[in-house]
A protein has these predicted regions:
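Gly/Ser-rich phosphate-binding catalytic loop and adjacent alpha/beta segment
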Residues: 2-354, 392, 400, 417, ...
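Internal, charge-rich low-complexity segments
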Residues: 95-109, 239-243, 248, 408-411, ...
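Catalytic-core signal marking the mid-to-C-terminal active-site face
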Residues: 583-750
């Protein structure tokens, strides 16, 4: 079948599929119209583009094969839209089935698999890179850092992007091995580069890849610049903008490599080995400046901390053990069993069957189960000696920690001897420890956290005289809010409550019914002195310390770390606390019970993804997500009428959080406005116990969060209180899923 024969068949097949799906209720009218307007025209454009033959000779034959096989749903999902350009760049599926991903791993970027404008492939990466390169040249930008993690063909995607930037005259700094995202975000300001890119999809399952884009200070681009990049460059980019300069043709002084002290054995430096910069050492030395225990190395000689580590097939496999070792820890037990310490983007230790795809997420209890069982296989009879077991995700920007449970509390965890600490408890403990060790000048300090992160952080900060800034979800918001405080704009946000400015304020009038684009609420920030960020954190296992005002907008904060999350840094911080606890004859688990809960009360946070694994697939999955949101908005109306309860708890108030940031994807209509930051139902007047439904804007999934609180004066038997609130959390999720018609049919290790 040639192109002329395929196009009319494709047009007819696409329309028939969309009409039938609409009539059957599998897609809604808005999605139908968008797909009808876009799919065939995008397909025709690709098939008639001669540049694609040059860049990816197997692309068109694979598309024609899909048309001949009448794979209309796959064709629609490949071409119904452009890959969505969001806060951090682009992210999406490379293909819709495992066989195609395996084929790409074996055959390379030009593997004969179905590609389109809505999949992550070499054409999309090259076109996006050309758009970003043109944006940068118009702004006078000259230097860029590029890296990649363990994702399938990550190196090839990164090298292709680098060749585009070399053609456009940039000086390129290219990592010579899979690297953690935070090493990229550190390298950018360290090298005075202008931008950075990491090929990664963070903790998403094996089907995904992406393009994380950072600005000169290592944070994500702010919303205004991001919109300029998309509206003025990405949207109008064509394959004609794609030009390549191979590494071996790069001009002198234009191509440098980032790595360790010596060249990697199996890496081709194109004859430029002399241009290797030891970035690993610089990043490590920077992190070590945050150590508060001066004699840690000597301490480890006499009372060594027993640390387990699991890379989950990711780029932390070398970086994290190296950092811990250099800091002075002697007993690091890396999990090598089942290939978990090898960079493998297929993530073979995680479920990959269609519809059940698991994420290599260190904050997921099932990932912790994989790590624990693999550790026991790898190091027989050693698990009982472990103090902590650390895990990081594929790009090592998230960190999870497994700890042993006291015997008398194991019934809380179905008899298990271990548990995965929630990020909420973990970050509260990190903050508590560092406040104890650095208690001076509290009036100058503040913390930043997302609105889905536990109020245990807010409480313990306030009780120690520290200000609090809550933002919407995403480290880009944490960094942007911190920059607002650095710039002295705290007065603009002291009147923001539940994300909304006062209606009669200037910003309130401008925003109307929309929430502030960044800030959720501030506490204790009105003294005019707070300028030093001592912690920035998220419920989703991300952490950093942003420091004080930077000397310029291209630098890290004064005394601060990277402006995005860093799992390697978090591992370093947690290990120090665990070592200190061991010196005191206690554990992380006991510290939380004995130092945190008695001070702030018991906060029990719950989290579930919907669906439990992956996302609702394709255009039909988009309809399912919207249907669940419509039901949630219906529950909001019931709550406002005073008629709603969950698991026997009456809802006292409710809010919808909407900034409008995804209105380009989900245009508002008379009957539906996308609640991008979610809906929240409160069970108490103090708003400390609540349930939140939050959708993904760029994927077909949702997040459910709960927070239940018991005042310290009401705790009594702490273990009993834990049991009661954990039990109620499970009941809340069950009732919520029943009401939303989103059953938890695959939740494992509850």
């Amino acid at each position: 079948m040639n192109i002329a024969q395929a196009l009319p068949l494709a047009e007819q097949g696409i329309l028939h599929y969309l009409d039938e799906a609409l009539q059957a209720g599998r897609i809604d009218g808005q999605l139908y119209q968008i797909a009808r307007d876009n799919t065939y025209s995008a397909l025709e454009k690709w098939l008639n583009d001669p540049k694609i033959d040059e860049l990816s000779p197997a692309a068109k034959p694979a598309i024609l094969a899909a048309i001949a096989a009448q794979r209309w749903e796959d064709v629609v999902n490949a071409f119904r839209q452009e890959v969505r350009f969001g806060t951090g760049g682009i992210r999406g599926m490379m293909a819709f089935d495992r066989d195609s991903i395996v084929r790409m791993k074996q055959d390379g970027l030009d593997a004969p698999i179905l590609k389109g404008s809505n999949t992550i492939n070499n054409i999309v990466i090259l076109k996006t890179s050309a758009a970003v390169a043109k944006f940068g040249k118009d702004k006078g930008l000259e230097k860029i850092v590029l890296g990649y993690d363990s994702r399938v063909r990550g190196f090839d995607f990164a090298a292709a992007a680098a060749q585009v930037f070399l053609h456009y005259g940039y000086t390129v700094y290219f990592f010579d091995a899979p690297c953690p995202y935070p090493e990229v975000t550190y390298a950018i300001p360290a090298l005075k580069a202008d931008m950075g890119i990491l090929i990664s999809a963070s903790h998403n399952d094996y089907r995904y890849n992406g393009y994380k884009l950072s600005c000169a200070n290592g944070s994500q681009f702010d919303p205004i610049e991001r919109d300029v990049i998309y509206e003025q460059y990405v949207k109008s980019a064509t394959t004609a903008d794609i030009h390549l300069c191979p590494f071996d043709q790069a001009a002198d002084g234009k191509l440098f490599f980032l790595g360790g002290e010596t060249p990697e054995e199996n890496f081709d430096y194109a004859g430029k080995e002399q241009n290797l910069i030891n970035m690993h050492a610089r990043h490590l030395d920077h992190i070590k400046t945050f150590l508060l225990t001066e004699n840690l190395a000597a301490q480890q000689e006499t009372k060594p901390l027993e640390i387990g580590y699991c890379a989950f097939h990711g780029a932390g496999n070398v970086a994290v053990p190296r950092l811990l070792k250099e800091t002075g820890y002697k007993r690091i037990w890396t999990i090598t069993k089942n290939g978990l310490n090898e960079c493998d983007g297929l993530f073979p230790q995680f479920e990959y069957r269609a519809g059940l795809e698991q994420q290599p997420d260190p904050g997921d209890m099932r990932a912790a189960h994989i790590a624990v069982e693999s550790f026991k296989d790898d190091h027989p009879n050693k698990f009982d000696d472990l103090d902590i077991l650390i895990g990081t995700d594929p790009d090592a920007d998230r960190c999870g920690v497994v700890v042993r449970v006291p015997e008398e509390q194991r019934f809380l965890y179905e008899g298990r001897e271990w548990t995965l600490l929630s990020a909420d408890d973990l970050w509260t403990l990190v903050l508590w420890y560092r406040m104890q060790r650095q208690s001076d000048a509290a009036e100058n300090k503040f913390v930043t956290l997302s609105h889905t992160t536990s109020d245990s952080v807010t409480r313990i900060a306030q009780q120690n005289g520290i200000g609090v800034v809550k933002t919407w979800v995403g480290f880009a918001n944490l960094a942007a809010a911190t920059a607002e405080i650095w710039n002295g704009h705290y007065r603009d946000y002291t009147e923001v409550v539940d994300g909304r400015h006062l209606p009669d304020s200037a910003k309130g009038k401008d925003l109307g019914n929309l929430c502030d684009p960044v800030i959720f609420q501030c506490y204790g920030m009105d003294n005019g002195k707070r300028s030093v960020n001592i912690a920035a954190m998220e419920q989703s296992n991300g952490f950093s310390i942003l420091g004080g005002p930077p000397p310029d907008d291209r630098s890290l904060g004064q005394g601060g770390h990277v402006r995005d999350k860093d799992g390697t840094f978090a591992a370093f911080l947690v290990a120090e606390i665990a070592a200190w606890a061991k010196e005191q004859g206690t554990t992380l688990y006991r510290l939380i019970d004995e130092k945190i809960y008695p001070e702030v009360g018991l906060f029990v946070a719950g989290y579930q993804a919907d669906p439990i694994d992956g996302e609702y697939p394709g255009i039909e999955g988009d309809r399912l997500k919207k249907a669940i949101l419509r039901r949630a908005l219906g529950l909001l109306q019931e709550a406002l009428a005073g008629d709603l309860e969950f698991a026997g708890l009456p809802v006292k108030s409710a809010c919808v959080y909407r900034t409008g940031k995804y209105d380009g994807i989900y245009p508002p209509t008379s009957d539906f406005e996308f609640p991008d930051e979610g809906l929240r139902f409160f069970f108490d007047d103090e708003k400390l116990s609540h349930l939140t439904i939050r959708p993904s804007g760029t994927g077909n999934s949702l997040r459910f969060h709960t927070q239940l609180y018991r005042e310290k004066e009401q705790l009594g038997d702490l273990v009993k209180s834990k049991y009661e609130l954990h039990f109620l959390t499970r009941q809340l999720f069950k009732d919520l899923r029943d009401k939303l018609k989103a059953p938890e049919w695959l939740l494992f290790l509850k």
